[in-house]
Amino acid sequence: MNQFFITSINIIKKQEQMEFLIGFFTEYGYWAVLFVLIICGFGVPIPEDITLVSGGVIAGLYPENVNSHLMLLVSMIGVLAGDSCMYWLGRIYGTKILRFRPIRRIVTLQRLRMVREKFSQYGNRVLFVARFLPGLRAPIYMVSGITRRVSYVRFVLIDFCAAIISVPIWIYLGELGAKNLDWLHTQIQKGQIVIYIFIGYLYYSFLEMEKI
């Protein structure tokens, strides 16, 4: 019962967030989408999927002013820019960045240790999976910079390959359901379930590869 109540609260919060973002994006257009996606990369508690869907919604509502394909391009730039910022903060400042209180809230020592263990265990594959893990994405990208295990070019290529799977789906889903938000919220929940299944499949594949 408690879990059902918590889930209901989360759904309501996401609906409110989407309504706010749709209004914000309608007012300020592509630049607003770019800005929000970049700060999402810093671990700000704004769901990236809701942000992308909201960008797609305004493309569906105002096709004469907003092009969905251009929205996809802007979104990809925003996603990669936000992720790159976390990488470079880690690469430039190293563990010193953890002295900065806002960063310390995102990248705790416990998360830092856990991410380092995952890197040792799975290598660069962790970067690909990180794109689908909202709570761990920022710490993983920052640690990849801190440890310097991967060059920036390789980092961007891996991040791009992961982003090009999810970003278009959310953008075009938002465009498709722009005039039926109730249906859209249902599809978002289904999409999130598919992502969790995909992550589980990747995790299982990694375990199988280790046995070989």
UniProtKB/Swiss-Prot annotation:
Q: Which residues form a coiled coil?
A: none
Q: Which InterPro entries match?
A: DedA-like, VTT_dom
| Membrane topology of the entry | Multi-pass membrane protein
- Subcellular location(s) per record: Cell membrane
Q: Does the keyword Cell membrane apply?
A: yes
Query: Any idea which UniProt keywords this protein has?
Result: Cell membrane, Membrane, Transmembrane, Transmembrane helix
Q: Which residues are the signal sequence here? A: none
Family named by the database record: Belongs to the DedA family.
Any idea what this protein is called? Answer: Uncharacterized membrane protein HI_1629
